[in-house]
């Protein structure tokens, strides 16, 4: 099963741009939003140093990572590989 971990923070400008794009895809992709300020352990676990960041998991394993604002199509391509 595929899942995207979406790392963001309330103070992050680019995250505010990516947030609505991710929300618009909620029926098409499986994702979980993770606040880096309140979930530092997850940020460390997945090596997140810049946000916004997307980590693609497949069967619990990291398959790919992207950093920065992506378009809806780019996210769908990232997810569907």
Language-model-derived ranges and their functions:
Residues 2, 28, 52:
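Alpha/beta-hydrolase fold active-site loops
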Residues 13, 38-41, 73:
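Short alpha-helical
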